[in-house]
Amino acid sequence: MRFFIDTANVEDIKKAHKMGILDGVTTNPSLVAKEGVDFHTRLREICEIVGDVSVSAEVIALDAEGMIREGKELAQIAPNITVKVPMTPAGLEAVAALSKENITTNVTLIFNPNQALLAARAGATYVSPFLGRLDDIGQDGMGLVETIAQIFVIHDIPTQIIAASVRNPVHVTNAALAGADIATIPLNVIESLTQHPLTTQGIERFLADWEKAQQ
């Protein structure tokens, strides 16, 4: 399973990139709004940092014509831009049109298997089921990822699954087991993946033993 970072903060992206584990970036209007910067300018900054890995940038328009227009504009920013569109009939129309022009697409806000299947049929490069948001309303977010993965295997569908709305390390482990191709996660969760109390204790013990040996 590959790792994307879910943020528009360049410092967070730099930290993840330096770890050598970053396979892509996902952004959305809410994340960019938090940064208080020009959307296109920030996307260029991100692309410069991460090189040629996928950078998902979401359209704002709700109609198909507007999504297609915005998607083409976003794709001009850098060759590794993936156009992110919401799961709606208009979104499917936009995905179909953009895919015909070899523009990679990520259909977001997936909450059931049929949505993922339709997005894939329209030509989506990625689908993004939202785990945490389903868990918030008492539904099985991880079960959704597993079901989508099974359907894609049965029907030999090449669309990749991005586990989104990932809140904790357990989500990451379970997404990998469920068959997600990618997990997109914020920096705090990435950092928590590196941590375990016994790792910390082990480091402290090694250092203490080393200091004793030098006396």
Swiss-Prot record:
GO terms for molecular function: aldehyde-lyase activity; transaldolase activity. It catalyses: D-sedoheptulose 7-phosphate + D-glyceraldehyde 3-phosphate = D-erythrose 4-phosphate + beta-D-fructose 6-phosphate. It comes from the Bacteria. CDD domains: Transaldolase_FSA. Keywords: Cytoplasm, Pentose shunt, Schiff base, Transferase. Pathway: Carbohydrate degradation; pentose phosphate pathway; D-glyceraldehyde 3-phosphate and beta-D-fructose 6-phosphate from D-ribose 5-phosphate and D-xylulose 5-phosphate (non-oxidative stage): step 2/3. The keyword Cytoplasm applies. It is found in: Cytoplasm. It holds the Pfam family TAL_FSA. SUPFAM superfamilies: Aldolase. Gene3D superfamilies: Aldolase class I. Its main location: cytoplasm. Coiled coil: none annotated. Its EC number is 2.2.1.2. The active site is at K84. The keyword Cytoplasm applies. GO terms for biological process: carbohydrate metabolic process; pentose-phosphate shunt. One of its GO terms (cellular component) is cytoplasm. Transaldolase is important for the balance of metabolites in the pentose-phosphate pathway. PANTHER family: TRANSALDOLASE. Belongs to the transaldolase family. Type 3B subfamily. NCBIfam families: fsa_talC_mipB. This is Probable transaldolase. It comes from Exiguobacterium sibiricum (strain DSM 17290 / CCUG 55495 / CIP 109462 / JCM 13490 / 255-15).
